[in-house]
Amino acid sequence: MEKKRSMTAAPAVAMTAVSMVLTVVVIVMWLGEAMPWAVALVVGLGLDGGWLATLAYERRLAARGDHSRAITGVGWGFGAVATGVLVAHALGEESAGAWLAVAWLPLAAKALWLVHGLWERTALTPTALDQIRDIQQDARDRAAVARAQLRAEAGTEVTRLEAVTGAGARVARVQAETAGELASAWSTLEEAREGEGTARALTCVTSRVTPTSPPSWRLPVWGPTEPVPAAIEGSADVVPLSNEEIDGIMSGLVDSGSYRVAAGRFRDMGYSAGEARLQASWRRVTREVAA
């Protein structure tokens, strides 16, 4: 943990030290011509000291998990002033490009401390990292097992569909062949029945047994031949019940407890009415009883 922490803290510390030394040297070189070098040194150390003090306080707050925008703003202000001093000095020198190349060091140091602070707020202990890795690995394992299971189920379903389709095709072929054979047999029977000598031959055979029967021969009938029952006589004369009459009958069946029982008893009594009318009458009667 400490080793990983130093990976972000060490660059920030090194950049801060270089920028502070550079700032002091530039201030002494720049202001030493107009004032004693001791005064210029004090000015440079004061600028660096203020920046270092705000940085130390900001790091103290970060260690407690706190944050102060005012302190952060003051720290960026010191960094901006130091950068401004370096830029102003570079513009007055003959080799301005070389000085401008290092004028960004104070702001870079401040940015590195910002990155280090962000890393600290998101840093985790090795135990937590191990747990996260275990959770991720477990999720990957479950996803792989689910994908394999889906692929296996898909393969099984494809095999089943192919088997069902093949069986259906075989059944269809057998049915087609059977239908063709039946059609051929019926055609042969029909030709035999319609033949000129068929009726004569059957008449000769059956005349001794049933002399009065007509000489006819019909194809056998396949399936049940129950006669359709005749319609009830006088059903057209039945007068349908009115809503009031249905309500009167259903009011006597309220004690049945449910509509199905009441409807069954209604029909057992010999009455007839549509399902919709019975349901509407039941609702009306039950509302009246409830009221």
UniProtKB/Swiss-Prot annotation:
Superkingdom, taxonomy of origin: Bacteria
Keyword Membrane on entry: yes
UniProt membrane topology term: Multi-pass membrane protein
Gene Ontology cellular-component annotations: plasma membrane
Location in the cell: Cell membrane
TM segment ranges: 24-44, 71-91, 99-119
Keywords: Cell membrane, Membrane, Plasmid, Transmembrane, Transmembrane helix
Function: Involved in plasmid transfer.
Designated name of the protein: Protein SpdB
Organism: Streptomyces lividans
Name of the coding gene: spdB
